[in-house]
């Protein structure tokens, strides 16, 4: 928290320079020394005020004899009492108004031959009555009246400002549109290339599948021919499965083993009688 002076009518804060062009120093109230504290408060004009340990007085309220210097550092003497206080409160509002207000210089006196500044022409709808007052030698005021015809308003040029932003927008959108079109064409070419690769892979898969079925069919036919040459005892049963007009699958099975009848006939076990 920055330090500031608690004395009335004083607004010194930490970092300011004092009357001796040195930084203003701050000192706490002697709360533990009752008589000295009362002397401080009497000189300040605040006898009934009780300061806290966080409030200070700046060095501008002490005389040079209240300080002692050691190694270039200014210390407050133990018996020092502040005695420099301003009794009259400064008029802050007046100082602010004086600082904010600028001095107004009186207007220069008008000369007789000084031409009056011309004001911009104001279009009117009818004749204007102009009254000119000026000092003359005969009478104090002379009145001259004349009729003025209103000036025709100057033709204003057609506004072409809204067209300029539209043209600028069109010229700015041209490169962006061209870049987007090129990107679309590039993506279309990539898609066509991927589709061609996919179709080639599908044809290759179909070809490999057909070749594998033909190889199996050939092996089955070979086994069939070998079984026919070996004889009926070593013959095998074959199952031919047609998967297409040019594809056939032959499955070979071992010959069925001889089976025993599950219900054998009952033998005649009767013993002949004697």
Swiss-Prot record:
Zinc finger (THAP-type): 1-85
Pfam family, one: THAP
Keyword annotations of the record: DNA-binding, Metal-binding, Zinc, Zinc-finger
Transmembrane segments: none
GO molecular function: DNA binding; zinc ion binding
Location of region: Disordered: 83-121
Annotated protein name in UniProt: THAP domain-containing protein 8
Gene source species: Homo sapiens
Lineage of producing organism: Eukaryota, Metazoa, Chordata, Craniata, Vertebrata
């Amino acid at each position: 928290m920055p330090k500031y002076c608690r004395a009335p009518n004083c607004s010194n804060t930490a970092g300011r320079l004092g009357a001796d062009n040195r930084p203003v120093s701050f000192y706490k109230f002697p709360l533990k020394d009752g008589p000295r504290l009362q002397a401080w408060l009497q000189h300040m004009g605040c006898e009934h005020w009780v300061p806290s340990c966080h409030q200070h007085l700046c060095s501008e309220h002490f005389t040079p004899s209240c300080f002692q210097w050691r190694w270039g550092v200014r210390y407050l003497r133990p018996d020092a009492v502040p005695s420099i206080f301003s009794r009259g409160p400064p008029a802050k509002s007046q100082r602010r108004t004086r600082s904010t207000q600028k001095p107004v210089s009186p207007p220069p006196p008008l000369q007789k031959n000084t031409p009056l500044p011309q004001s911009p022409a104001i279009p009117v709808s009818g004749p204007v009555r102009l009254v000119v007052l000026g000092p003359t030698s005969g009478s104090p005021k002379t009145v001259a009246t004349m009729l003025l015809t209103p000036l025709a308003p100057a033709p204003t040029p057609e506004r072409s400002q809204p067209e300029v932003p539209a043209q600028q927008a069109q010229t700015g959108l041209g490169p962006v549109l061209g870049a987007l079109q090129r990107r679309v064409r590039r993506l279309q070419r990539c898609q066509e290339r991927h589709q061609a690769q996919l179709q080639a892979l599908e044809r290759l898969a179909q070809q490999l599948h057909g070749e594998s079925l033909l190889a199996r069919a050939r092996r089955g036919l070979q086994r069939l021919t070998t079984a026919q040459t070996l004889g009926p005892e070593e013959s095998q049963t074959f199952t031919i499965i047609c998967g297409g007009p040019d594809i056939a699958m032959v499955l070979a099975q071992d010959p069925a083993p001889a089976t025993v009848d599950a219900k054998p006939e009952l033998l005649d076990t009767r013993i002949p009688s004697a």
